[in-house]
Amino acid sequence: HYTLQQAILLQSLATWLALNIKLHLQVQEMAVLASADELTGTFNRREFVQESNQTMQHFSHTRVPFTIGILDIDHFKQLNDCYGHTAGDHVLKKMTKKIKDILREGDFLARIGGEEFAIILPACLGDEAMRVFKRICSTIEAMEVHYEQEVLCFTVSIGVAEVGKHDADAEDVFKRADKALYCAKQAGRNRIHFAN
C-alpha cells in the first residue's frame, strides 16, 4: 500500500517520464526531417556534406577508397516548363525510387538541389563504379513516367570522381565530380564523364 504522498510522487514521476519520452521521440523525428529531402525521401545536401566528410575521414584512416557521382536530369527545366512543376516532382520521385533499387547497401544517395543528386559509392572504384553509374543511366533512359495522360521520358548526365591522393577533403572530390558533370553536359548529355 502506498501513502498519498508516495502515490502523488509516483504519478509525478510517471508524467515526467512520459513527457521525456515524447520529447525524445520529437527530437528524433526532427533529426530525420533535418536530414531528409521532403519530396524524394532521400538525404538532403546537409546530410551529403556530413556523410562525404565522414567517408573522407574513414579513407584517411583506412585507405578504403570511394567514388562520388553527381547526377543531373537533362533538360529538366523544359520538362517543368512544358508539363508543370507537379510533373517534375513526379519524375523526381519515380527516378529516385529507381536509383535506390540499383544502389548497393551502404551506398549513399542525396538530393543536393533541384534535379541534382549526389551518390557516394564506398569501397567502389573504376570499372565497378562505372557499372553502377551505367546501370543508373540506362535504367533512367528506359523509364516511362506516366503523368496524367502523358508519358514522360528523360535522361541524366553523371559526373564521377574517385578519391585521390591529392584530395585534401571531400569537397575536392565533389568539385572534381561536379566539373565532370559539366563535361558530360557539354559533350551532349545522357552520358557519364569520369574526372581525371
Predicted regions and their residues:
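Amphipathic alpha-helical "output/dimerization" segments
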Residues: 2-22
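Hydrophobic scaffolding residues in well-structured cytosolic catalytic/regulatory domains
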Residues: 30, 48-55, 117-118
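Conserved nucleotide-binding and Mg2+-coordinating catalytic segments in signaling enzymes
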Residues: 31-50, 71-85, 93
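Active-site-proximal structural segments of metal-dependent nucleotidyl cyclase/transferase enzymes
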Residues: 51-83, 99, 110
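Short beta-strand->loop micro-motif that forms the acidic, two-metal-ion catalytic signature
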Residues: 77, 92, 98-100, 110, ...
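Active-site-proximal alpha-helical element of nucleotidyl cyclase-like catalytic domains
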Residues: 87-108, 116, 135, 140
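A short pre-motif secondary-structure segment
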Residues: 108-111, 152
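Catalytic-core segments of nucleotide cyclases and related cyclic-nucleotide turnover enzymes
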Residues: 130, 134, 148, 163-195
